[in-house]
Amino acid sequence: APPGFTPFRS
């Protein structure tokens, strides 16, 4: 995954 990628955003 690229830097700063998140599978979810809270």
Swiss-Prot record:
Tissue distribution of the protein: Expressed by the skin glands.
GO biological process: defense response; vasodilation
Record carries keyword Secreted: yes
Superkingdom of the organism of origin: Eukaryota
Gene Ontology terms, MF aspect: toxin activity
Subcellular location field: Secreted
Keyword Secreted in record: yes
GO cellular component, one term: extracellular region
Record key words, sorted: Amphibian defense peptide, G-protein coupled receptor impairing toxin, Secreted, Toxin, Vasoactive, Vasodilator
Described function: Produces in vitro relaxation of rat arterial smooth muscle and constriction of intestinal smooth muscle. May target bradykinin receptors (BDKRB).
Family: Belongs to the bradykinin-related peptide family.
Protein name: [Ala1,Thr6]-bradykinyl-Ser
UniProt source species: Physalaemus signifer (Girard's dwarf frog)
